[in-house]
């Protein structure tokens, strides 16, 4: 924790600098950042799992306590209004006592509806950042999630501080242990549901604590991009395993994917080819490179794999131009990663939030930025046998370029995705996932 404490001072200084800058531009007195409120299920007395506002947890690792507030102006010591009710029904959060508390003036709030007593008196000139606009209106905020402030903060969130990078390394380190446990469970005959339990136990986090719903897909289920069903029974024949799963550390996410074949076969060879391509793409990352160019390079590699593995005929550029590669690789190469799995700022050209759209032929690409130092991105090329997409090729002449016999052979395996989390440095790339132990 000493290293985090060392980096945290500079982290808070940078956040204060950003706040002071945007407040000066927008002639605002400060920001009031709301952690959020519980959401109750319809016609029930149970709340949905609480997820803190990412703008709130950017400042401090208070992740599970609703009704907290931050009052910041970039000059004075930030004020944390920490919710600690008198409650004999539920576990009440302890008063914070960690390395970060010295950087905040902490006030305890015992009743959520009394927060106005702790807020600035000239509230009309402060901006509210949060989800609950109705609460903000009642409290008197006239500026609620102003576009200029949000665009500025989102643009700069893509540049991680050293504190944030260390948190993300630790999130990767934790997730790697889960992936190794899940891989072992797969080869020992576990079902999807059982593999999930092995993963969660290894990372020491519940389903509500990991940053997103894990994808644990055996066999043809791997062709479903966001598969989260978790079958309880093991398949009669074990062919393949795709796992897309991360972990959290102090509010920062990791997002890692691996694919395994149960036996040595053509699908296993395809995994090896995809792994090689993914590492080559990561080697292409450097400051000044356009992320969409990396995505297009991925399609060239996928096209070559289609040719090499007798899935399609033709030439590389023709397979791309006709949209054939998009039927096998329909999603984007990756995205920004940080406080959110699909972190903000991936389309921001500048501090004003000028939007750079994804290429028309690749609408699912989640990042169009030019790479810069201290950005963290996922790199996750894939190749899948998705019948709904491949059937579209059958409707025209493109279907004649597909070797449907090979498609039929690979269909039971579902698909492949390999995903690492990479820090772009000025002079190198840091592949956190591989360097922390998930080498295959």
UniProtKB/Swiss-Prot annotation:
Report the GO terms under cellular component: cytosol
Gene3D superfamilies on file: Creatinase/methionine aminopeptidase superfamily, Creatinase/prolidase N-terminal domain
Whether tRNA processing counts among this entry's keywords is no
Q: Which UniProt keywords apply?
A: Dipeptidase, Hydrolase, Manganese, Metal-binding, Metalloprotease, Protease
Top-level taxonomic group: Bacteria
Q: Which residues bind Mn(2+) 1?
A: 255, 335, 380, 419
> What EC numbers are recorded for this enzyme?
3.4.13.9
Instruction: List the Pfam families hit by this protein, alphabetically.
Output: PepQ_N (PF21216), Peptidase_M24 (PF00557)
Explain how, and how many, cofactor molecules are bound: Binds 2 manganese ions per subunit.
MF terms from GO for this chain are: aminopeptidase activity; metal ion binding; metalloexopeptidase activity; phosphoric triester hydrolase activity; proline dipeptidase activity
Which BP terms does GO give this entry?
proteolysis
At which positions is Mn(2+) 2 bound? 244, 255, 419
Q: Which CDD domains match?
A: Prolidase (cd01087)
The entry's family comment says: Belongs to the peptidase M24B family. Bacterial-type prolidase subfamily.
This chain's function reads: Splits dipeptides with a prolyl residue in the C-terminal position.
This chain's protein is named Xaa-Pro dipeptidase
Question: Which species is this record about?
Answer: Shewanella baltica (strain OS195)
């Amino acid at each position: 924790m000493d290293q985090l404490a060392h980096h945290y001072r500079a982290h808070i200084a940078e956040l204060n600098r950003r706040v002071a800058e945007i407040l000066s531009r927008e002639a605002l007195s400060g920001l009031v950042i709301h952690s959020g409120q519980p959401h109750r299920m319809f016609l029930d007395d149970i709340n949905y799992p609480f997820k803190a506002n990412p703008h709130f947890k950017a400042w401090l690792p208070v992740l599970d306590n609703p009704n907290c507030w931050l009052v910041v102006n970039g000059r004075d010591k930030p004020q944390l209004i920490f919710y600690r009710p008198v409650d004999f029904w539920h576990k009440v959060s302890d008063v914070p006592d960690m390395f970060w508390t010295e950087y905040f003036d902490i006030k305890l709030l015992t009743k959520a509806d009394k927060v106005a007593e702790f807020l600035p008196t000239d509230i009309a000139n402060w901006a509210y950042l949060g989800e609950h606009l109705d609460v903000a209106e009642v409290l008197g905020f006239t500026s609620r999630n102003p576009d200029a402030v949000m665009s500025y903060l989102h643009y700069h969130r893509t540049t991680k501080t050293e504190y944030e990078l260390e948190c993300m390394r630790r999130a990767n380190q934790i997730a790697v242990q889960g992936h190794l446990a899940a891989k072992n469970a797969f080869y020992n005959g576990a079902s999807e549901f059982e593999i999930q339990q092995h993963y969660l136990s290894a990372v020491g986090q519940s389903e509500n604590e990991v940053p997103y719903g894990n994808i644990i897909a055996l066999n043809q289920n791997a062709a479903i991009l966001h598969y989260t069903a978790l079958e309880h029974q093991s398949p009669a024949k074990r062919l393949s395993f795709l796992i897309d799963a991360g972990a959290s550390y102090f509010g920062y996410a990791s997002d890692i994917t691996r694919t395994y074949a149960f036996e040595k076969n053509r699908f296993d060879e395809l995994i090896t080819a995809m792994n090689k391509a993914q590492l080559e793409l990561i080697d292409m990352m450097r400051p000044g490179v356009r992320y969409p160019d990396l995505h297009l390079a991925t399609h060239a590699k996928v096209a070559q794999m289609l040719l090499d593995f007798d899935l399609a005929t033709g030439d590389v550029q023709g397979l791309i131009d006709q949209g054939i590669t998009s039927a096998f690789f329909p999603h984007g190469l990756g995205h920004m990663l940080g406080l959110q799995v699909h972190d903000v700022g991936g389309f921001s050209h500048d501090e004003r939030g000028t939007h750079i759209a994804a290429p028309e032929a690749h609408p699912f690409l989640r990042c169009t930025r030019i790479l810069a130092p201290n950005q963290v991105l996922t790199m996750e090329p894939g190749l899948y046998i998705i019948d709904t997409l491949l059937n579209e090729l059958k409707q025209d002449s493109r279907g004649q370029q597909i070797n449907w016999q090979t498609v039929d052979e690979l269909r039971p395996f579902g698909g492949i995705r390999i995903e690492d989390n990479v820090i772009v440095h000025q002079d190198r790339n840091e592949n956190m996932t591989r360097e922390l132990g998930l080498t295959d």
